[in-house]
């Protein structure tokens, strides 16, 4: 027990110096409790890395699944993103015999995650025609894989929306943006750590190892999410009785009130445009580095770490200035950092010397802008929403962000491939289509800034 107390004391003393947003901890809600709660973001990071990174490559290369079919499967989780607003509202108004609001929804999402991961490896092997499944009807593998990805996506959206709402319930209103920022920092950590673990486990790929890794992720998701929500919400019979008698508006009424708040529609439009531009960049940076700058697979993989470092720097900067009273909409113009970033990325393929360094600088700048933009718009959304509808506001923010990012990822590949297919437009070079897409992204971000200007003039929070 003495060692545990010593470790917790040193964690509370030193973490604020090195971990962004760690200063949100207090005597009532110590950092150890917040970090334990953030384990749900670790499982979300594991899932995102497994789907978008590891399985993306395994399905195309090792399992020889057509790339178009892989894209459809990876887009399945996006179908559930618009429902995050409803999830947030349901967790705000949930009625429980134990007086719990968020924990039941986190558990529901965990079950969805587990179910999807449990059937996913076998569905993918059937989809690829592995072994005796080569004679199975094609629709069986496609249907099972689609169901697996849809279940996992639904689980991730439910867990993240309810988990973030629970995090905001634990702290004072002025600290809510900071605690959500801390949760997103842990999401980035989860993505980086899980990428290293998955890479090591699947270094020598076999179908059996694929089954072990995916089902191990299913088990880890259950264990970590249970640890995250354990004793975070206090059981209260009195609160349960209040829940039974409390009158709540319908979802339509609550959503209408939220959208009727001054500036909310314009704010969500800015979020959609800015995140859409980010989504288009996310899917093309690594192939651009390989084809335009001739970077190796190992070198392009490190772009993820550089990108995450820039995002962390943006989150940390936004946390510091917003904590000192700065207006979030002014800092949401952090997407202006991404416009020069895209210019640097485009120029990196057009100069003969030091192009790689310019590309790396542009990648970091894009990550920095994303961190500033994401935290500032999240803070603005929470400040605009009513105090008793934080879950609904977080759901709306998450729904817009996830949907816009998914559409950006899908459209970037389509536009790039369409430009490549145009005869004689770019000659035999591979750089032109990429640079055109990056230029489109920069224009979209400029439009986002234009939509943010009226919010700045209004002088809102």
From Swiss-Prot:
Keywords: Antenna complex, Cell membrane, Membrane, Transmembrane, Transmembrane helix. One of its GO terms (cellular component) is plasma membrane. It is a multi-pass membrane protein. Residues 1-36, 84-109, 164-182, 229-261, 320-338, 377-394, 457-461 are cytoplasmic. It comes from Rhodobacter capsulatus. Residues 57-62, 130-142, 203-209, 282-302, 356-358, 416-436 are periplasmic. This is Protein PucC. Gene3D superfamilies: MFS general substrate transporter like domains. It is found in: Cell membrane. The chain crosses the membrane at residues 37-56, 63-83, 110-129, 143-163, 183-202, 210-228, 262-281, 303-319, 339-355, 359-376, 395-415, 437-456. The keyword DNA-binding does not apply. PucC is required for high-level transcription of the puc operon. Belongs to the PucC family. InterPro entries: MFS_trans_sf, PucC, PucC-rel. Coiled coil: none annotated. Disulfide bonds: none annotated. It holds the Pfam family PUCC.
């Amino acid at each position: 027990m003495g060692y545990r107390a010593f470790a917790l004391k040193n964690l509370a003393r030193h973490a604020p110096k090195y971990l962004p947003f760690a200063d949100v901890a207090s005597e009532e809600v110590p950092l150890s409790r917040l970090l334990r709660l953030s384990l749900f973001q670790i499982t979300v990071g594991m899932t995102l890395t497994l789907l978008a990174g590891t399985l993306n490559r395994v399905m195309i290369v090792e399992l020889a699944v057509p790339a178009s079919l892989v894209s459809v499967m990876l887009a399945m989780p996006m179908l559930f993103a618009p429902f995050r607003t409803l999830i947030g509202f349901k967790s705000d108004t949930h009625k429980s015999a134990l007086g719990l609001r968020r924990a039941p929804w986190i558990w529901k999402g965990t079950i969805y995650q587990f179910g999807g991961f449990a059937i996913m490896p076998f569905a993918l092997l059937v989809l690829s025609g592995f072994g005796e499944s080569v004679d199975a009807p094609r629709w069986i593998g496609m249907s099972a894989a689609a169901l697996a990805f849809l279940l996992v996506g639904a689980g991730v959206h439910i867990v993240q929306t309810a988990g973030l709402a629970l995090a905001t319930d634990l702290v004072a209103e002025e600290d809510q943006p900071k605690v959500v920022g801390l949760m997103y920092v842990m999401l980035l950590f989860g993505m980086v750590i899980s990428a290293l673990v998955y890479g090591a486990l699947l270094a020598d790929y076999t179908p059996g190892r694929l089954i072990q890794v995916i089902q191990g992720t299913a088990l880890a998701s259950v264990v970590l999410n249970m640890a995250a929500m354990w004793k975070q919400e206090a059981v209260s019979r009195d609160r349960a009785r209040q829940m039974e008698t409390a009158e709540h508006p319908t979802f339509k009424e609550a959503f209408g009130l939220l959208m009727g708040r001054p500036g909310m529609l314009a704010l969500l439009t800015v979020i959609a445009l800015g995140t859409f531009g980010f989504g288009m960049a996310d899917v093309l940076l690594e192939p651009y580095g390989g084809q335009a700058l001739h970077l190796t697979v190992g070198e392009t993989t490190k772009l993820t770490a550089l990108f995450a470092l820039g995002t962390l720097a943006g989150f940390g900067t936004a946390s510091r200035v917003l904590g000192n009273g700065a207006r979030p909409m002014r800092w949401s113009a952090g997407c202006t950092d991404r416009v020069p970033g895209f210019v640097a990325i485009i120029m990196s393929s057009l100069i003969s010397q030091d192009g790689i360094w310019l590309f790396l600088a542009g990648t970091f700048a894009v990550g920095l802008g994303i961190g500033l933009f994401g935290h500032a718009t999240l803070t603005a959304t929470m400040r605009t929403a009513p105090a008793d509808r934080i879950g609904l506001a977080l759901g709306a923010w998450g729904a817009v962000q996830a949907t816009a990012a998914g559409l950006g990822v899908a459209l970037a590949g389509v536009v790039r491939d369409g430009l490549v297919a145009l005869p004689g437009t770019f000659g035999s070079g591979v750089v032109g289509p990429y640079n055109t897409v990056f230029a489109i992204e920069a224009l979209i971000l400029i439009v986002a800034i234009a939509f943010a200007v009226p919010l700045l003039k209004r002088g809102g929070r």
